[in-house]
C-alpha cells in the first residue's frame, strides 16, 4: 500500500482527520450493525475506512474525488470483499453500492466548500426529501455550520437552515474537533454532528413545505425585522394575526425566535385561508 508523496490539496478542501479519539467517536456515533451498508464520503488515506471495515457493517462504499488517493485506497482495502470504491464527485456520481443496493448510513468528512449541496443531496429539501431516508448520517462539518443546524429558536445562530434541517431530521452534536486534529490544520474549528432523518410520514406535507420555504426566504432576508414587516401574504393584517396566533406566533417576533413546527403551522394556516378565499 502506498500513497506516495501525496499531500493534501487545497482545491479539494482536503484536511485529513488524524485524531484517534475523534475517529472513535465517529464510529461510536454511527452505531453500525451487521445489516448496515455504509457510504463514506471523502475517505482520504483511509483512517476512518479502516475502522469502518473493522466494525460489523455488511459493506463500506467509499466515494473519493482525488484520483491520486484512489489507487492507494484500493491497494490498502481492495482485498476486503466488504469494501468498494468509486472515483468521482460525490455531488454527481451515483451513491448506490456496486450491487445496486442503497447505503443505510452515511459517514462523511465534508469539504467545507460543498457542505450545502451535499447536505441537500444526502437529506433532500423540505419539499423533496430523500426517499427513503438514510437511517443515520454522521458528518464532520465546520463548527459554524453545525451550530446553525442544531441551534434552538432564539439563539443568534438560529437560521432558515436550522428550520429546514430540524424539520427533516433529529440533529445532535457528537463532539467538537479543533484544528490540531487535522493534517493540515484548517483555519476554522469543526464539529461532528449526528442526523437521524425523520420517516417520511413524520415530515410535513410537501405542499406545506413549499409554503414554508417561501416564508423562510421572506422572513430571514431581514432577520432583524419583526415578522409584521417581512411577511408578504394576501390576507389582511387582522386575518394574518389570527392565523399567526393559532400557530403560536406573535407578529412582533423576529424570524429566529420562531420554532420549526410553528413555521409549519403558519404555512398550513395560510394555505387553508387561501383555499377558503378561492372557493368564495
UniProtKB/Swiss-Prot annotation:
Its main location: cytoplasm. GO terms for molecular function: 16S rRNA (adenine(1518)-N(6)/adenine(1519)-N(6))-dimethyltransferase activity; RNA binding. It holds the Pfam family RrnaAD. InterPro entries: KsgA/Erm, rRNA_Ade_diMease-like_C, rRNA_Ade_Mease_Trfase_CS, rRNA_Ade_methylase_Trfase_N, rRNA_adenine_dimethylase, SAM-dependent_MTases_sf. It is found in: Cytoplasm. It comes from the Bacteria. HAMAP family: 16SrRNA_methyltr_A (MF_00607). This is Ribosomal RNA small subunit methyltransferase A. It comes from Synechococcus sp. (strain WH7803). The gene is rsmA.
